[in-house]
Regions:
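Surface/interface-facing alpha-helical segments and adjacent flexible terminal/loop regions used
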Residues: 1-148
C-alpha cells in the first residue's frame, strides 16, 4: 500500500469514527469498487447487496451502538486528579499535536478529547501525507507507552 492509499484509509477511518456516514458518503463508497476491494470481500458484498437507505439505516445503528450508546472511541481517556477527562493542554496527546504543528479546535465539534480516535487517525493521515516516517513512529510509540501506564 502506497502513502496515498494509507492517507486515504486514515482519512476514511477518521471520518467513520467521528460521526455516522452521510448518504452521500455511503453512495461514494458504494460506487467505488477499488475502495470496496481494499476494505474486503464482506464489505463489498454488504454494499453491493443493499441500497443506500438500507446501508444508511444499518450503518447508523452500528455507529450508534458502537460509539454512542456503549462507549466512545476515545483511546485512553486521560484523566486529571478529579478523574475528569483532560481535554486541553493538560492532555499529553494535545501537547504532542501542538509540538508537531497539528492544531485542533474541539469547540466546534462533538469530539470531546484530543485522544479521540478520529482525531488521532486524522493526525496520522497528515503525517503520512507529509512523509514524516520518524514522527509517525514517535506518535505510535508514545501512544503505546501511555496505554501501558
Amino acid at each position: 500500500m502506497d502513502n496515498t492509499q494509507r492517507a486515504f484509509v486514515y482519512g476514511f477511518l477518521s471520518t467513520v469514527f467521528s460521526d455516522k456516514l452521510s448518504k452521500e458518503s455511503i453512495a461514494d463508497i458504494k460506487n467505488n469498487p477499488n475502495f470496496l476491494d481494499l476494505i474486503g470481500e464482506n464489505a463489498r458484498r454488504f454494499f453491493d447487496e443493499n441500497d443506500i437507505d438500507v446501508l444508511d439505516e444499518e450503518l447508523n445503528i452500528d455507529f450508534t451502538s458502537a460509539f454512542l450508546v456503549n462507549s466512545h472511541p476515545v483511546e485512553s481517556s486521560v484523566t486529571d486528579a478529579k478523574h475528569q477527562i483532560s481535554t486541553g493542554l493538560e492532555n499529553p496527546v494535545m501537547n504532542f499535536y501542538i509540538e508537531n504543528g497539528f492544531e485542533i479546535n474541539l469547540n466546534n465539534t462533538n469530539l470531546l478529547t484530543p485522544d479521540h480516535i478520529a482525531i488521532e487517525l486524522g493526525f496520522m493521515q497528515n503525517l503520512v501525507l507529509s512523509a514524516d516516517l520518524k514522527l509517525q513512529k514517535d506518535f505510535m510509540r508514545k501512544r503505546s507507552e501511555e496505554r501501558r501506564v
